[in-house]
């Protein structure tokens, strides 16, 4: 029996556009991609990250000087998958504006704060959460030690990324990420994860 939630999530709305050659149908995400809007929606994993990276590279090739808007609603996920999106955001020429819609937790919060300085936004009721990467590898003692060392390296790297984009001192970042740390939009702004809280497009436009 199909889960009705899964069925709903797999239903992607279609939009019809009138062109000189007649009507053309797009799925809603492809239509928004034409407007240079990229969605980071749901858990961050390899499949999702490769789609986001491909969209960013496509938009850069299309126009390297025009801003890209990234909408984020994510509980986080695989660290390396999130870092592939992060690195691409820093690598491409277009400025990337970020906006959290709903939640930006774990790697979602890192992608949110990685947007262009002054162009990182939150809707008023969004939630943001930061924490350290989790381990949990099982196996031989030596392998467990190797994976523990790798987790520590990732933790140190993520700390440095948050320091870079928030302007917070390293000790404050380390302390904040020690446990799940939930913030509302105002707290995220005070912490430097975002630049502005927007309630309407008019507010967003005046913030730029």
UniProtKB/Swiss-Prot annotation:
It holds the Pfam family CLP_protease. It is an enzyme of class 3 (hydrolase). One of its GO terms (cellular component) is endopeptidase Clp complex. Its EC number is 3.4.21.92. PROSITE patterns: CLP_PROTEASE_HIS, CLP_PROTEASE_SER. InterPro entries: ClpP, ClpP/crotonase-like_dom_sf, ClpP/TepA, ClpP_His_AS, ClpP_Ser_AS. NCBIfam families: PRK00277.1, PRK12553.1. This is ATP-dependent Clp protease proteolytic subunit.
């Amino acid at each position: 029996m199909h889960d009705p939630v899964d069925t709903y999530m797999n239903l992607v709305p279609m939009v019809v556009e009138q062109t000189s050659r007649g009507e053309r149908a797009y799925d809603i995400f492809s239509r928004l991609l034409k407007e240079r809007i990229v969605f980071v929606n749901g858990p961050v994993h390899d499949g999702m990250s490769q789609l986001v990276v491909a969209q960013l590279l496509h938009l850069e090739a299309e126009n390297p000087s025009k801003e890209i808007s990234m909408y984020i609603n994510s509980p986080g996920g695989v660290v390396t998958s999130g870092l592939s999106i992060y690195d691409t955001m820093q690598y491409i020429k277009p400025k990337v504006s970020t906006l959290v819609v709903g939640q930006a937790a774990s790697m979602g919060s890192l992608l949110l704060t990685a947007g262009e300085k002054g162009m990182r936004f939150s809707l008023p009721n969004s939630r943001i959460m930061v924490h350290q990467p989790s381990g949990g590898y099982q196996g031989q003692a030596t392998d467990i030690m190797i994976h523990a060392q790798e987790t520590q390296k990732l933790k140190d790297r993520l700390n440095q990324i948050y320091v870079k984009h928030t302007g917070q001192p390293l000790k404050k970042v380390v302390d904040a990420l020690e446990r799940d740390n939930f913030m509302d939009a105002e707290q995220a702004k005070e912490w430097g994860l975002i630049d502005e809280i927007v309630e309407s497009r008019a507010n967003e436009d005046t913030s730029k």
